[in-house]
């Protein structure tokens, strides 16, 4: 596989048929019963969401998003979500390129920082791509839906 064959672009409605199964590789949530039209409309309504797909030979092999948060103090911050690369494409720098694309979006939107949450086994991957842990910083989550 040649690196230049991966094309990154903004996610489109038609991509959901491939993005949802890809997300299944990331989490145990069952996306098969979700109404893709409703999901797409909710995604579009949130104009702070910026999702992109990576295409290889016309097939979606990667997905990621960066949510832009406008701060009251006049700055913007980005939060990376749902980074996933198809199992068949892992180890081929697709994830590295996906992160670079999302960082560029953050720069274009004027973000002063980007944060992300990841599982411990992925920590070194993100550190190699410029992210750092912050001492004494702990992520807390409150799930409102199962």
Stretches with model-predicted labels:
Residues 1-14, 146:
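Conserved N-terminal entry element of GNAT/NAT acetyltransferase domains
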Residues 115-117, 121-123, 127, 132-146:
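Conserved catalytic-core motifs of GNAT/GCN5-like acyltransferases
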Residues 53, 65, 79, 84, ...:
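Conserved beta-strand segments that form the floor/walls of ligand-binding pockets within enzyme
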Residues 10-14, 18-21, 25-75:
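Acetyl-CoA-dependent GNAT
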Residues 69-80, 90, 136:
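A conserved beta-turn-beta hairpin within the catalytic core of GNAT-like acetyltransferases
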